Amino acid sequence: MATNVVLDFERPVVELEAKLNEMRECLRSSSREQAPVESDALSKEIETLEKKVDALRRSIYKNLTRWQKVQLARHPERPYTLDYIYMMTCDFVELAGDRHFSDDKAIVGGFARLEDRASGYSQPVMVIGHQKGRDTKSNLYRNFGMAQPEGYRKALRLMKLAEKFRKPVITLIDTPGAFPGIEAEERGQAEAIARNLYEMAKLTVPVIVVIIGEGASGGAIGLGVGDRILMAENSWYSVISPESCSSILWRSWNYKEQAAEALQLTAEDLLKQGIIDRIIPEPMGGAHTDPEAMASTLKGMLIEELKALMPVPEKELVNNRIEKFSAMGVWNDEG
């Protein structure tokens, strides 16, 4: 898929592709006028440049820094929760409101059906996730994916509903953090997130957590307790954003690259640390370059995980989940 947004580290590839397109257009427009020898020479030159572009693209995306992965996770054309829901599931019915205060548009959720027609697999699920906007108007409507307390309470209400009807829960995380406004604090932001952690740990149905973009601090963990944690290749998950970390440690946002390295916030880092269970491979260039391929990959992995989790007895499911999170962050001094 063509993209209108170019990140700094992608410019060398974009510039070569522009040159390549010019050469292709030149070949098309002049092939009838030029001698066969000249056309053949131009064709060979194009072929050589195509190989160079492909090699450069692979070199860039196979050697991304942690900060560059943060940039890809924030790409404005990256697929969001509703995109994945509509690409992966059918019969989605959105449910609204926390039954206490309001309906937070930064979190969406509802019942859907996860199907694989080739194998005949069909599983009703409850899917919940953060939702960002694509432009200024929709971002204001979605509060830039930063949930209020009522968003987390809505999410918990839907999880409890799924538990009542014995349906597994899938959460999709993509947030720069929970909304930090005074009004959110007055309505119990910290309590709402803490309550979700407590209740999610005890849910008697399978819970699969997927980090699809940004996973910042309490805003992410409020939907992040599950039996299996999957993470997109170019996403990030951390207690703090690189910019905020930089502003605290160096009193400036100019050290965000160093902060990203220190935080070790990528999928590869977190897999090594035992925080996540699997990495979801992305198309070359990021999920936004081929959203349908990305959704297909994620759908396949979700079906695999659900097939493994659905037969697990309730008590064992809860005990395993609690043990999984209790083991995180344990440090042993062997010296």
UniProtKB/Swiss-Prot annotation:
Catalytic activity, EC: 2.1.3.15
Residue pairs linked by disulfide bridges in the UniProt entry: none
Quaternary assembly: Acetyl-CoA carboxylase is a heterohexamer composed of biotin carboxyl carrier protein (AccB), biotin carboxylase (AccC) and two subunits each of ACCase subunit alpha (AccA) and ACCase subunit beta (AccD).
Please give the name of this protein.
Answer: Acetyl-coenzyme A carboxylase carboxyl transferase subunit alpha
Naturally occurring in which organism (per UniProt)? Chlorobium luteolum (strain DSM 273 / BCRC 81028 / 2530) (Pelodictyon luteolum)
| Cellular localisation | Cytoplasm
Which InterPro entries would you find in this protein's record?
A: Acetyl_CoA_COase_a_su, ClpP/crotonase-like_dom_sf, COA_CT_C
The biological processes this protein is annotated with in GO are: fatty acid biosynthetic process; malonyl-CoA biosynthetic process
Entry function: Component of the acetyl coenzyme A carboxylase (ACC) complex. First, biotin carboxylase catalyzes the carboxylation of biotin on its carrier protein (BCCP) and then the CO(2) group is transferred by the carboxyltransferase to acetyl-CoA to form malonyl-CoA.
